[in-house]
C-alpha cells in the first residue's frame, strides 16, 4: 500500500479500531517512517512479511492485546528500535524467522503474559548485537536473566548477543545447545558447559563467538560430545578435563 514511500514520516491511527491485518511489504522501504503507534491498533492480528523492513521506527514499541503473529522479516533492518513490548499481547502465537533481524539497537523484548506463544523462531533475533534480554515464562518457553530456554530448561535457545556478563555457566538442567544459541558477544569471555550437555547443534557458536579473541570455553564432561557438523569452535580456546585432551581431539 505504501511500499517505498520514502518521504512518509508518520501514519495517524487515531480511532483505527477495526484494522486486523497489515499486509506484507505494506510499509517496506519507508525509510523515514518513525511515527506508528501499534498500541492503538486493538483489533490488529497479523503483520505480514517485511511489512516495516528498513523503516525509521524508533524507541520503544508496544503492541495491543489482539496481535497473533508477526511475519518473516516484519521489522528487519529497523535499526532504531530499542525495545518491543508484547506484555499485553495475550493472543500472540507466532514470531517468525527474521522478525527483528538487523535491529541493531534492540535491547529488550518482553513476552511476559504471552501464554499462547508457541512458535518463537530464534532466527527472529539474528544480528541483534545490542539485545540484552528476552523476557518470557509460559508453557513453551522460559527465560532466566534474559537467556532463553524451552520451558523445562533442557534446551538453551539463545544467549543474547548484547548481554553484559564476562562469564556464564550453563545450568545443569540443559542437555542441548540449540542452533545459533551463542551469537558473537563481545562481553562474554568465559563459558562453562556442564556434563549435562549431550548435544550441541550446528553453528551453536556463530559469527566467531569465541574465535581468536582470547575467550575460552570450559568443557566439564570427560566424554567428548559427539558432533556431526561444525559448531563454530574451530579456532576457540577450549579447556577440557585433565587427561582427556586426546579424546577431545579425536
Show which residues each predicted segment covers.
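Predominantly extracellular/luminal carbohydrate-interaction, adhesion, and secreted-enzyme modules
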Residues: 3, 205-206, 230-233
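Structural signature of tandem-repeat unit edges
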Residues: 6-21, 31-46, 56-69, 79-94, ...
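Consensus positions within tandem repeat domains that build extended binding/scaffold surfaces
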Residues: 1-3, 23-28, 48-51, 71-76, ...
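Short, aromatic/basic amphipathic alpha-helical patches
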Residues: 229-232, 246-250
Amino acid at each position: 500500500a505504501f511500499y517505498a514511500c520514502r518521504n512518509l514520516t508518520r501514519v495517524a491511527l487515531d480511532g483505527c479500531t477495526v484494522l486486523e491485518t497489515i499486509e506484507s511489504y505494506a510499509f517496506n522501504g519507508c525509510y523515514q517512517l518513525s511515527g506508528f503507534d501499534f498500541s492503538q491498533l486493538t483489533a490488529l492480528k497479523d503483520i505480514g512479511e517485511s511489512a516495516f523492513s528498513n523503516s525509521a521506527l524508533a524507541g520503544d514499541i508496544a503492541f495491543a492485546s489482539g496481535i497473533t503473529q508477526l511475519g518473516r522479516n516484519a521489522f528487519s533492518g529497523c535499526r532504531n528500535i530499542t525495545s518491543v513490548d508484547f506484555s499485553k499481547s495475550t493472543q500472540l502465537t507466532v514470531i517468525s524467522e527474521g522478525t527483528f533481524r538487523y535491529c541493531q539497537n534492540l535491547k529488550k523484548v518482553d513476552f511476559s503474559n504471552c501464554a499462547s506463544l508457541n512458535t518463537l523462531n530464534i532466527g527472529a533475533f539474528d544480528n541483534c548485537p545490542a539485545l540484552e534480554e528476552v523476557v518470557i515464562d509460559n508453557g513453551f518457553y522460559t527465560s532466566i536473566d534474559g537467556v532463553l530456554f524451552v520451558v523445562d530448561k533442557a534446551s538453551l535457545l539463545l544467549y543474547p548477543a548484547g548481554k553484559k556478563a564476562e562469564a556464564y555457566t550453563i545450568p545443569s538442567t540443559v542437555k542441548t545447545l540449540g542452533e545459533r544459541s551463542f551469537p558473537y558477544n563481545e562481553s562474554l569471555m568465559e563459558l562453562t558447559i556442564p556434563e549435562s550437555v549431550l548435544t550441541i547443534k550446528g553453528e551453536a557458536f556463530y559469527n566467531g563467538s569465541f574465535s581468536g579473541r582470547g575467550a575460552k570455553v570450559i568443557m566439564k564432561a570427560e566424554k567428548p560430545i559427539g558432533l556431526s557438523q561444525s559448531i563454530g569452535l574451530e579456532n576457540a580456546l577450549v579447556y577440557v578435563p585433565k587427561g582427556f585432551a586426546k579424546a577431545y581431539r579425536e
